């Protein structure tokens, strides 16, 4: 006889009895089946970490590339700005030069018109003979002018630089040192005729200076050191003798703020050059001090000496010196010598 299969109710009863009778067995069964879930979760976490690391690496690489590109762009912008500034400065310089040349051309045109209006019968008071006479005819802009020839004296046309501003204006500049581009270690003939660039460093020429100082004349010497300090010295009754008198220097009273007067020592001395020694010393001062000047024995000043630049300016005896200010071995940065009539009225 066949047995009937056990019903669901029967199986449920068996399970309950087993649970009550042997609870430890069920716990072992439960513990045996659960570890699969944590292992699965750990594996999933590792994959996510790897993905995150890969994303971070990609972002870091992208950020690095962006930084490099930004640096390149920044350098390019800086270079463009620098180039624009340089171009702007060049344009400003060209514009300034053009304005200066335009002003000088206008001055020359006006002077030529004055020359055309002049006659041989004019008095000396009407003639144009230096920057002070130009000033009195209302030329008030500093710059280059051409003085007309003097038929009575037989002097040729002369290009001069006029200072129409300093201490009332009307000054004719006879010497300038500011760039060091022109050597002042010259011979007698060159100092007689003049040399250099009228807009830069130059010596006007002893013959011209002699002619300009035949009337009572005032001399002004302006100096600048390498620290930017400015000083001046002025002398009344400045006279430069003729060539027969070796362009001898004569000076009157000194005024100024440069300290000790370092030009008075050269008063009443003849002019000397490397090929014509007229000093009052056994030594050949022009060769020792490497300039053309009114050397005595030898100098308290040497305004036509060697131009030494910053760093070399305080080591030599043959520089552009003024002993009463910085001593015998300090070469100045800038010097100008200028003259105008004693009776000049701004």
Curated annotation (Swiss-Prot):
Pfam families tied to this protein: Fibrinogen_C
Segments forming a coiled coil: 39-119
Single GO MF descriptor: identical protein binding
Any single biological process term in GO: blood coagulation
Primary localisation category: secreted
Keywords tagged on the record: Coiled coil, Disulfide bond, Glycoprotein, Secreted, Signal
Official protein name in the record: Angiopoietin-related protein 7
Organism of provenance: Homo sapiens
């Amino acid at each position: 006889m066949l047995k009937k299969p056990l019903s669901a109710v029967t199986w449920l009863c068996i399970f309950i009895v087993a649970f009550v009778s042997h609870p430890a067995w069920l716990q072992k069964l439960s513990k045996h089946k659960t570890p699969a879930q944590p292992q699965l979760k750990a594996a999933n976490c590792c994959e996510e970490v790897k993905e995150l690391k890969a994303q971070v690496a990609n972002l870091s690489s992208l950020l690095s590339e962006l930084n490099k590109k930004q640096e390149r762009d920044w350098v390019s912008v800086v270079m463009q700005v620098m180039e624009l500034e340089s171009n702007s400065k060049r344009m400003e310089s060209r514009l300034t030069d053009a304005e200066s040349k335009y002003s000088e051309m206008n001055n020359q045109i006006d002077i030529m018109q004055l020359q055309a209006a002049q006659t041989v019968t004019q008095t000396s008071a009407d003639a144009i003979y230096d920057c002070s006479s130009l000033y009195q005819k209302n030329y008030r802009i500093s710059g280059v002018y051409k003085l007309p020839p003097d038929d009575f004296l037989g002097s040729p046309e002369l290009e001069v630089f006029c200072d129409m501003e300093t201490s009332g204006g009307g000054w004719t500049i006879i010497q300038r040192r500011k760039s060091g581009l022109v050597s002042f270690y010259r011979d007698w003939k060159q100092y007689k005729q003049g040399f250099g660039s009228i807009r830069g460093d130059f010596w006007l020429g002893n013959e011209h200076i002699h002619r300009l100082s035949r009337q009572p004349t005032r001399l002004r010497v302006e100096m600048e050191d390498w620290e930017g300090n400015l000083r001046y010295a002025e002398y009344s009754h400045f006279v430069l003798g003729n060539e027969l008198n070796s362009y001898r220097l004569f000076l009157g009273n000194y005024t100024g703020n440069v300290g000790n007067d370092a030009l008075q020592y050269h008063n009443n001395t003849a002019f000397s050059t490397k090929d014509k020694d007229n000093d009052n010393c056994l030594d050949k001062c022009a060769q020792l001090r490497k300039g053309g000047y009114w050397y005595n024995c030898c100098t308290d000043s040497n305004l036509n000496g060697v131009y030494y630049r910053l760093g070399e300016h305080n080591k030599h005896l043959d520089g552009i010196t003024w002993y009463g200010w910085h001593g015998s071995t300090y070469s100045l940065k800038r010097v100008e010598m200028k003259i105008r009539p004693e009776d000049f009225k701004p």
